[in-house]
Swiss-Prot record:
It is found in: Cell membrane. The gene is lspA. It comes from Shouchella clausii (strain KSM-K16). The active site is at D110, D125. This is Lipoprotein signal peptidase. Its EC number is 3.4.23.36.
C-alpha cells in the first residue's frame, strides 16, 4: 500500500508540474479563489521559505538518505499498520517527486500560492507535510496503545 500511495503522489505531482511548465509562463498567476488561492508558476532552487538556495548536492544526498530510511521503515515497521503505510507512502512520494525535479530541472516547480506570506508549494510538498503529520499521529497512537496495554 505504501508504494501505491507513493506512485500516485509521484504521478499527480509530475503531471501537475508538467501542466504548469507547459501551460503557464514563469511568473504567471491565475486566481482560483481571489485573495485566497492562486496558481502561480514559480521555480525554487532551495527549500521552503527560500532556504539553501542552489544547494543541489545537499538535496541529492539528503533525499537519497531519506528515501532509503523510508523504504527500510516500510519493509520493517509498517507491516499491519495502515496509517504508517499511508504516512510513509506520502513522504516517499513527496520526496521522490521533488527529487525528480531537482535531477531533471535543477529546480523545483512550485505553483500553489495561498494568501499571506506562506511559501508557494506543490503536490509533493503537500504530501510530505501530510505524511509527516500522519507519521507523528501514528507515534502518538502507538504510544497510547502501548500505555493502555501495560495497565
Amino acid at each position: 500500500m505504501a508504494y501505491i500511495v507513493a506512485l500516485i503522489i509521484i504521478a499527480l505531482d509530475q503531471l501537475t508540474k508538467w501542466l504548469v511548465v507547459t501551460s503557464m509562463e514563469l511568473g504567471e498567476r491565475i486566481p482560483i479563489i481571489d485573495q485566497v488561492l492562486y496558481l502561480y508558476s514559480h521555480r525554487n532552487t532551495g527549500a521552503a521559505f527560500g532556504i539553501l538556495q542552489g544547494q543541489m548536492w545537499f538535496f541529492y544526498v539528503v533525499t537519497t538518505i531519506i528515501v532509503g530510511v523510508i523504504i527500510y521503515l516500510i519493509q520493517t515497521e509498517a507491516k499491519g499498520n495502515r496509517l504508517l503505510k499511508i504516512a510513509l507512502g506520502l513522504v516517499l512520494g513527496g520526496a521522490i517527486g521533488n527529487f525528480i525535479d531537482r535531477l531533471l530541472r535543477q529546480e523545483v516547480v512550485d505553483f500553489i500560492d495561498t494568501f499571506g506570506d506562506f511559501p508557494i508549494f506543490n503536490i509533493a510538498d503537500s504530501a510530505l507535510t501530510i505524511g509527516v503529520g500522519l507519521f507523528l499521529l501514528n507515534i502518538l497512537i502507538q504510544g497510547r496503545n502501548e500505555k493502555r496495554s501495560t495497565r
